[in-house]
Amino acid sequence: MAPRIEAQEIETYWNIFSTRTNGGKFLNGEQAAPVLKNSGLRDDQLERVWDLADVDNDGNLDFEEFCVAMRVIFDLLNGEYADVPTTLPDWLVPESKAHLVQANRALTGKAVQFEQVEDEDDSPGLKDGFDWYMSPADKAKYEQIYQENRDMRGEVAFSALQDLYESLEVPDTDIRSAWNLINPSAGSSINKDACLAFLHILNNRHEGFRIPRTVPASLRASFERNQIDYQIDSARNNAAAQSRWATRADDETSTGRKAKFGDQYLTRLGRSGFKSAGTDFSSGAKTDAEWEEVRLKKQLAELDEKMAKVEAGVERRKGGQRDSKPALVKRELDQLLDYKRKQLRELEEGGGAAKAGGNLKSVGEDLQTVREQVEGLEGHLRSRQEVLEQLRREIEDERAGR
């Protein structure tokens, strides 16, 4: 299984990166120098590490490129490399920059071609008679796998199918032989037609047939035209193909396993859509939007911490004097309102001053005055309640992470 940068490692790099950039998106040479030199590597090695990690050649390292630089340094220190590698391994190429690496390899002629592996004619259990004919069911399955793994240009890299390789009973040498066979130009990726042919070869090898040594001339020419006659020699081979596919898919035989080619792989994919090669530095890639979400979550956590401190201070103050000024004013107004209502009720019921024989006109005037006072106090109470509610809303907004 290919190496990878684990989530915990990415988190460590993120803490270093965010601290050095103060929340920015890029790390310049001056900011990165203390971190890189702390490794103890020579200056010339660190310069080559920088050039290797700066995939887009903008003179700065974004977070993904910083992860690449740190991982290369750690691999050097741990003895994985004797010296700084001249090119990035495919698994370490940032997913968002894979197209830049592929373009650079194409321009410099550094596209990787696997070592040619000779077929072993004496491989036990393998059969002759590889058939280039693709049944409609097989072709549909190949196209589904292609759709799940193609990049934005409609091409598939060798490493994009790593999970498929692991689900097959096919040696790595045979997989690479098949790749070399349909990729004679040693490109970093192949188009749809070549991908379908590659999957067909793997399917037959999974069934127990030897990898073919050559591609038919007509098929090779159709690769160059980006068109393939998938029914090559179909009239001659159709009857034989039908007899080979006669075994039921659930039979535990080599031909039964053929029908299951890629089924486990596609089930694990769950038709999840485009899946490109490279490392997606989010334990499996974060986009710029996702890293922005990380930054915002960090800021939110800081605001929550500040709010917790403010609330703790409020609670401490409440311990000494429980009532804030708005609450104290509200309580006094409530008490005054209750008193005036009580006076009004006594006057209306003939108690108090009226019972003592007070002047009826005077009582009426007092009653009107009390009513006005009560209305004024109620209006004032409403206004103070609105002010209090506004204060509460502001506190809630601040607490929600404004």
Curated annotation (Swiss-Prot):
Pfam families: EH (PF12763), End3 (PF12761). Residues 285-401 form a coiled coil. GO terms for molecular function: actin binding; calcium ion binding. It is a peripheral membrane protein. One of its GO terms (cellular component) is actin cortical patch. Keywords: Actin-binding, Calcium, Cell membrane, Coiled coil, Cytoplasm, Cytoskeleton, Endocytosis, Endosome, Membrane, Metal-binding, Repeat. Its main location: membrane. SUPFAM superfamilies: EF-hand. Ca(2+) binds at residues 54, 56, 58, 60, 65. Residues 9-99, 138-226 form the EH domain. It is found in: Cell membrane; Endosome membrane; Cytoplasm, Cytoskeleton, Actin patch. PROSITE patterns: EF_HAND_1, EF_HAND_2, EH. InterPro entries: EF-hand-dom_pair, EF_Hand_1_Ca_BS, EF_hand_dom, EH_dom, End3. GO terms for biological process: actin filament organization; endocytosis; endosomal transport. Residues 41-76 form the EF-hand domain. Belongs to the END3 family. Component of the PAN1 actin cytoskeleton-regulatory complex required for the internalization of endosomes during actin-coupled endocytosis. The complex links the site of endocytosis to the cell membrane-associated actin cytoskeleton. Mediates uptake of external molecules and vacuolar degradation of plasma membrane proteins. Plays a role in the proper organization of the cell membrane-associated actin cytoskeleton and promotes its destabilization. Component of the PAN1 actin cytoskeleton-regulatory complex. PANTHER family: ACTIN CYTOSKELETON-REGULATORY COMPLEX PROTEIN END3, EH DOMAIN. This is Actin cytoskeleton-regulatory complex protein END3. It comes from Chaetomium globosum (strain ATCC 6205 / CBS 148.51 / DSM 1962 / NBRC 6347 / NRRL 1970) (Soil fungus). The gene is END3.
